[in-house]
């Protein structure tokens, strides 16, 4: 019986991480790595949620936003057309130069994830504003 409960909680932990990993990465690669490594141990759902909540308090840097953008773009670049690839480069450059904000980058990724039905990204809270806390 105990094993069934553990598997169930583990499933919730994996779902939570699947939904929040890019949100965490957007805020801090160090927190992302720390949580990823901690997930290899026996943590409770509550502990994982607490770690995520703490990570989300960190102010995103230009580098952390670009890193998260690049990771998510990796799921889209194969299906994106040439115009979208060019737009991706321009948007990233505009972000680095302070011409656009983080949300503009995320909206671009969300639009393409929807267009190409990239479920892995669509499950991410950072791209799914309707599910953001």
Question: Residues of each region from the PLM?
Answer:
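Short runs of predominantly hydrophobic/aromatic residues within well-ordered alpha helices
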Residues: 31-32, 65, 69, 88, ...
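Active-site histidine-anchored catalytic micro-motif
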Residues: 1
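Fungal-biased detection of long, low-complexity, Ser/Thr-
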Residues: 76-85, 96-101, 118-122
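Short, small-residue-biased leader/transition segments that mark boundaries at the very start
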Residues: 4-5
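Intrinsically disordered, low-complexity, mixed-charge
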Residues: 9-51
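C-terminal amphipathic alpha-helical interaction region
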Residues: 99-130
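Long, compositionally biased charged/polar accessory segments in the mid-to-C-terminal portions
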Residues: 38-93, 108
